[in-house]
Amino acid sequence: MNNIVNAEILMENGGLIKLELYPDIAPITVENFVKLANSKFYDGLIFHRVISGFMIQGGDPNGVGTGGPGWQIKGEFALNGVENNISHKRGVISMARSMNYNSAGSQFFICHADSTFLDGQYAAFGKVTEGIEVVDEIADVATNFNDKPITEQKMISVRIIAE
């Protein structure tokens, strides 16, 4: 991979998740994430779905799993005819979607544990390089019957970091 895009998620509690994104593997997905981050779309949004031992999901402006940015992007994964060799291991960031392969918009998830059964079905586009303990803290909060944290897990900002 020649190109790497660096990003940071700053949490309300001061926790920082550093990511590297791979535009050579998932160019549409990375471009979309960068566009949303640069427009401050994610600022103030929550991780609305948290399942310890699986993943933490955020990026919905509605905070319940139904919202997006007003557009959808092509799903960059094998079942949709796109080669993507990023495996859904602990710390990998990927796009959430509905049953429609091309329905991803702004919602993303970070794998709390290896979830390789998702490989080829979801557009992985990067990984956590620092702050996996912050992912662990989010994954370990108490949740309701919809897997929504009882205490909000709010992102203050998502920023693209120039190298």
Residue ranges and their predicted role:
Residues 1-163:
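Cyclophilin-like peptidyl-prolyl cis-trans isomerases
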